[in-house]
Amino acid sequence: GLGSVLGKILKMGANLLGGAPKGA
């Protein structure tokens, strides 16, 4: 659904910023 699409976009954005802040 729309939530999945938004989630993918957010993940892609985080990756573009240098990866998700897992160790932050």
Swiss-Prot record:
| Record bears the keyword Amino-acid biosynthesis | no
Keywords per UniProt: Amphibian defense peptide, Antimicrobial, Secreted
For this record, the Gene Ontology CC terms, alphabetical, are:
extracellular region
Q: Does the keyword Iron-sulfur apply?
A: no
Q: What's the family?
A: Belongs to the gastrin/cholecystokinin family.
Q: What does this protein do?
A: Antimicrobial peptide.
Q: What is this protein called?
A: Caerulein precursor fragment BM1
